[in-house]
Amino acid sequence: MTSQRTRERLIQRLCEEGVSNTKVLDVIRRTPRHLFVDEALAHRAYEDTALPIGHNQTISQPFMVAHMSELLLEAGPLDKVLEIGTGSGYQTAILAQLVERVFSVERIKVLQDRAKERLVELNLRNVVFRWGDGCEGWPALAPYNGIIVTAVAPEVPQALLDQLAPGGRMVIPVGPAGEAQQLMLIVREEHGFSRRVLGAVRFVPLLNGPLA
């Protein structure tokens, strides 16, 4: 079930759903998603669906990974991206092959440790990890010209807005956990921020504080 044919079916599905960035599609095609899920779920790794990874977290649906990556890159290449919510490390691995440097924050230590191991296995070495509160971002290394948030916040954290470079782009789900949520694209412009609502989504909540 992890054959090239299985992966190609996923790519075909993503194209049918509107993903058109060939770089994003190529990276998803060659990234072994089955390495980012438990062995018992490996046979479902190339389905276009979110899957549980423990600790009440999920590996995001491939379409959402592709869509958010595509939105982030819509205005051109990025050299410095902040990811909030490492999770399984799958989105991290996709970003690491699309941008120059990724800075990834995860509050659940055991998930972060597993993600690190997977990225080393894939020889992806342009990622720096931080165990901590994603709501705070990573101010010491700011600003970032891209920020991607993989959990839903009731409102856009001001700390993340502050860490977005001029012209930078943030993709973030916003809304109450378990209720109607919207994916938003935020761009830092000369005199403030522009916001574009991109459609309904469902994500796990963005929580405060690190967790061992």
Curated annotation (Swiss-Prot):
A GO molecular function assigned to this protein is: protein-L-isoaspartate (D-aspartate) O-methyltransferase activity
Active site, renumbered: S60
Q: From the Swiss-Prot or TrEMBL record, state where the protein is found.
A: Cytoplasm
According to the lineage, what is the superkingdom? Bacteria
> Catalytic activity annotated for this protein?
[protein]-L-isoaspartate + S-adenosyl-L-methionine = [protein]-L-isoaspartate alpha-methyl ester + S-adenosyl-L-homocysteine
Q: Where are the annotated coiled coils located? A: none
Q: Which CDD domains match?
A: AdoMet_MTases
Which UniProt keywords are given for this protein, alphabetically ordered?
Answer: Cytoplasm, Methyltransferase, S-adenosyl-L-methionine, Transferase
Per the record's keyword annotation, is Cytoplasm included, yes or no? Answer: yes
Q: Does the keyword Cell membrane apply?
A: no
GO BP annotation list: methylation; protein modification process; protein repair
Q: Where the protein is mainly located, per its record?
A: cytoplasm
Do you know which InterPro entries this protein is assigned to? PCMT, SAM-dependent_MTases_sf
One GO cellular component term noted in the UniProt record for this chain: cytoplasm
Q: Return the similarity comment.
A: Belongs to the methyltransferase superfamily. L-isoaspartyl/D-aspartyl protein methyltransferase family.
Name the job this protein performs.
Catalyzes the methyl esterification of L-isoaspartyl residues in peptides and proteins that result from spontaneous decomposition of normal L-aspartyl and L-asparaginyl residues. It plays a role in the repair and/or degradation of damaged proteins.
- Per its record, how is this protein called by name? Protein-L-isoaspartate O-methyltransferase
This protein's gene is called pcm
